[in-house]
Swiss-Prot record:
Disulfide bonds: none annotated. This is ATP synthase subunit b. It is found in: Cell inner membrane. GO terms for molecular function: proton-transporting ATP synthase activity, rotational mechanism; proton-transporting ATPase activity, rotational mechanism. The gene is atpF. It holds the Pfam family ATP-synt_B. One of its GO terms (cellular component) is plasma membrane.
Length: 156
């Protein structure tokens, strides 16, 4: 093998090129790669953080929806309870009013019965007096007396 000066010159040039590359070219490349790596890592962590925030937001939305559903169901139940209470109150008032009307009607009917009895007593008394007058005006005869009683029965 023949070592000549060209080979040494090429080695020197290669070493200078390697030194120049390591001194001036390699650090910016390493810095660029490090920055890119850092940006990728930051992007991945931001993506994971965003994903976690999205999941948390979904959980909050689900909780708020569940709360809203529960509130709605509670309001419906309360409204139904109030409706039942109002219906019961109206029913009780209607029953009380019906009882009052029935009691008033019974009292009115009783008054009318009493009034009719008083009127009937007056008429019976008048008829008895009239019958007694007629009996006393005539002479006491069994046949006439029986006829007058039959007449009075017919009038009653």
């Amino acid at each position: 093998m023949n070592l000549n000066a060209t080979l040494f010159a090429q080695m020197v040039v290669f070493l200078i090129l390697a030194w120049f590359t390591m001194k001036f070219v390699w650090p910016p490349l390493i810095n660029a790669l490090d920055e890119r790596s850092k940006k990728i890592a930051d992007g991945l962590s931001a993506a994971e953080k965003g994903k976690a925030e999205l999941e948390a937001a979904h959980k909050r939305v689900d909780q708020e929806l569940a709360q809203a559903r529960n509130d709605g169901q509670q309001r419906i139940a309360d409204a139904e309870k109030r409706a039942v209470a109002v219906a019961d109150e109206i029913k009780a008032q209607a029953q009380a009013e019906a009882a009052r009307i029935i009691a008033q009607a019974k009292a009115d009917a009783e008054q009318q019965v009493v009034k009719a009895r008083e009127t009937l007593r007056g008429e019976v008394a008048a008829l008895a007096v009239k019958g007694a007058e007629q009996i006393l005006k005539r002479e006491v005869d069994q046949a006439a007396h029986a006829d007058l009683l039959n007449q009075l029965k017919a009038e009653l």
